Amino acid sequence: MTIDKTYPIFTVRWLTVHGLAVPTVSFLGSISAMQFIQR
C-alpha cells in the first residue's frame, strides 16, 4: 500500500527532473556553440 503511494510521486519527480534537465543541457549546449562561433 505504501509502495503504491510512493511510486507515482517518484515517477512525477523523475519526469520533472528530466523535463528541467533536458532544456538546461540544450541551453548550455547552445551557449557553448555560440562561444565557439564567436572565437
Swiss-Prot record:
UniProt cross-references to Pfam families, sorted A to Z: Cytochrom_B559
Residues reported in the UniProt entry to bind heme: 18
Source superkingdom: Eukaryota
GO molecular function, one term: electron transfer activity
The record's free-text note on cofactor binding: With its partner (PsbE) binds heme. PSII binds additional chlorophylls, carotenoids and specific lipids.
Location in or out of the cell: Plastid, Chloroplast thylakoid membrane
Record function comment: This b-type cytochrome is tightly associated with the reaction center of photosystem II (PSII). PSII is a light-driven water:plastoquinone oxidoreductase that uses light energy to abstract electrons from H(2)O, generating O(2) and a proton gradient subsequently used for ATP formation. It consists of a core antenna complex that captures photons, and an electron transfer chain that converts photonic excitation into a charge separation.
Annotated protein name in UniProt: Cytochrome b559 subunit beta
The species this protein was found in: Cucumis sativus (Cucumber)
Gene: psbF
